[in-house]
């Protein structure tokens, strides 16, 4: 009996010790993660909100709170190291941006006093607030203001992105001034590090480069669905999904890929409202890859290969861009046929997801070869409340076969004709090519 009690006590000690050890490991791990996700106390963030964010209260919500590039990832500032800028944040933009000048200078001075001359002040601006930050940077370049030490800039949804921002597309355009919008052109080069974060198809930072009607219509829908202040809040810049990163000198450009074209979102909204998603989604999935090709033809590229070159809007689409699109058409048609067979529902507004970024002077495109996961915002929206009958299997198979035939015919049209004669290469059938990651709807 005594031995049995000793063994019982020993087992209890082992269990308690193991539990305590695991608890300590988990606690320490969470503590370490918390430290890794927080900007050092020697640095500070000054935030300038977008329209109607007069107190800069929404900046800390961006990208789940981790919106400051530090140590190869995105982190949040320490709780007592965020300094919001108070300004009118309204329309017309020109007078509102001018109103934010002095409050920004004051807040940078306060932050500098708190962290000292050796710390870094990160100036983060969203949309209209990014213009306030851009003007402040230009004053630093001109020597009219002194930040008192190192500063870095983070521009979210900025119209000054060199290749994509609407101000860069239409530099010094006079008529905009009549509406209170005076284009100041692309962001001015600076010796300070800058990070531009843009949501794909948001026309403020990702406006079409060419007069493509489909691209312009999609951009208009993108303004309604993607430019709203809460859009970036649910995404995580440290989540390995669809994001494209390009580093040029001191500047880092990030394009957050969208799941679906904003142009098709009204149809998805109506489909959700009347519980017909199970029918409409296979059809939308069938046409979206090809429609996306047509929309993307209105941009210089979709792989962010040259985001730092200021590019004006042009009425003419270069023949090379048209040829690139035609070469990708067979793969898009095949992808559409495959989507029609699967027909996975996706009814929420175009979500955005991102992957971690390493701020090194190298180019990197997120390595995953599949579309990004959807950030669900409402389960009731994504799931029809009542079962919906699908069309007869035979009818869907007929449509699918017809689409496959079209894809095969188009693909054969673009195949080089075989040589005739004894030296001709043996005939072979090429496998259907899928659209590349940069051309898929992410």
Where are these regions (language model features)?
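Composition-driven, intrinsically disordered low-complexity tracts enriched in small residues
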Residues: 1-123, 134-442
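Active-site loop->helix "elbow" adjoining a glycine-rich segment at hydrolase catalytic centers
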Residues: 127-130
